[in-house]
């Protein structure tokens, strides 16, 4: 309850807080034409798999190449809807697996808060790996999904082949609090006031898909170098039913609350797989968090993208897909 109260207050009204400004001094992976975006017309398959405790998890696969990538979406509480169509270029020559985390999207909704714990999410990732017969898997985690991938790496480093943290949520609880403060400072008083009203409607049981879209649009506009680039989204922020949308924010807060005062910075030294951490200079997530992730994993590469925010494929698609594909191919050769 204390965590929920604190975070609800943080969403609309946290005071301004400035994180360390990232620079372009970190070398990016070299680009080549083979990594450029291509047609989004790729083979698609979807279905359900059984997660921890019998929970049904919705999945979608793109492509049919021998190399396999598992994508972990952000949130918590959101769905793959903002990623599966937008990251389709990764399916060039490989199979890309997306899944909706428990309690969101098309996966089974969860009534018992205890079933939304970190342990359940990690067990679900293990279920995804087992369902697709992967001895080891390449994880690509975005935002909260990057943090979840970090927790998975802590527990199951031997089951990883490669690790990509795309604009990951901070590896510490204090870093997340700083992130919330930066979002509030960027949003301004009028937007913060409306966000506060929406949060009130959510917990009054009046949330629906349209309200979810408004909330996410207001909040995520602070995540971009240029908010106009939000129009480049091919999928949907809240591409879910009203019932799922109504549970998004409570699910989000429950999952974050279950993490306690997390700190992964000293818990990843045993992770030895090729690792790439991506950070955009305009991201609201503090640069220090991406730096800490890269420093915590031996040999990890930190790629800082100029004039790009939290969703680099929407603001700098050609360098993003080129660089990411270059990393994945080179990692295969190591």
Regions found by a protein language model. Give the residues of each.
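Conserved alpha/beta-hydrolase "acid-adjacent" motif
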Residues: 284-289
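Flexible "cap/lid" loop of the alpha/beta hydrolase fold
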Residues: 164-201
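Conserved acidic catalytic loop of the alpha/beta-hydrolase fold
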Residues: 119-137
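Alpha/beta-hydrolase
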Residues: 186, 190-266, 273
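Conserved hydrolase catalytic core segment
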Residues: 135-178
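Catalytic active-site module of serine/aspartate enzymes centered on a nucleophile-bearing elbow/loop
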Residues: 300-334
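Short beta-strand/loop motif that positions the catalytic acidic residue
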Residues: 271, 277-279
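Conserved HGGG/HGGXW glycine-rich cap/lid loop of the alpha/beta-hydrolase fold
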Residues: 51-109
């Amino acid at each position: 309850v204390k965590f929920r109260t604190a975070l609800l207050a943080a969403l609309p009204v946290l005071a301004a807080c400035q994180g360390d400004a990232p620079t372009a001094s970190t070398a990016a992976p070299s680009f080549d034409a083979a990594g450029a975006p291509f047609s989004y017309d790729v083979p698609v398959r979807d279905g359900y798999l059984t997660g921890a405790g019998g929970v049904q998890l919705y999945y979608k696969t793109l492509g049919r190449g021998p190399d396999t990538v598992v994508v972990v979406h952000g949130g918590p509480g959101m769905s793959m809807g903002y990623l599966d169509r937008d990251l389709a270029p990764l399916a060039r020559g490989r199979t890309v697996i997306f899944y909706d985390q428990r309690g969101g999207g098309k996966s089974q909704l969860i009534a018992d808060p205890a079933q939304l714990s970190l342990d359940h999410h990690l067990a679900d990732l293990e279920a995804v790996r087992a369902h697709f017969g992967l001895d080891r898997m390449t994880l690509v985690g975005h935002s909260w999904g990057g943090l979840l991938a970090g927790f998975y790496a802590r527990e199951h480093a031997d089951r990883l082949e490669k690790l990509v943290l795309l604009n990951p949520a901070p590896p510490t609880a204090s870093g997340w609090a700083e992130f919330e403060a930066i979002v509030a400072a960027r949003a301004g008083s009028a937007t913060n006031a409306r966000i506060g009203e929406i949060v009130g409607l959510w917990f009054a049981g009046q949330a629906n898909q349209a309200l979810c879209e408004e909330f996410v649009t207001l909040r995520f506009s602070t995540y971009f170098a240029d908010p106009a680039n939000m129009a480049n989204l091919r999928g949907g922020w809240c591409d879910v039913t009203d019932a799922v949308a109504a549970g998004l924010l409570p699910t989000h807060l429950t999952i974050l609350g279950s993490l306690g005062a997390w700190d992964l910075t000293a818990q990843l030294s045993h992770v030895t797989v090729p690792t790439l951490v991506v950070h955009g200079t305009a991201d609201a997530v503090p640069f220090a968090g991406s730096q800490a992730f890269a420093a915590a994993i031996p040999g990890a590469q930190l790629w800082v993208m100029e004039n790009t925010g939290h969703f680099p494929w929407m603001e700098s698609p050609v360098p993003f897909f080129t660089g990411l594909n270059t990393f994945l191919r080179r990692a295969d050769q190591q």
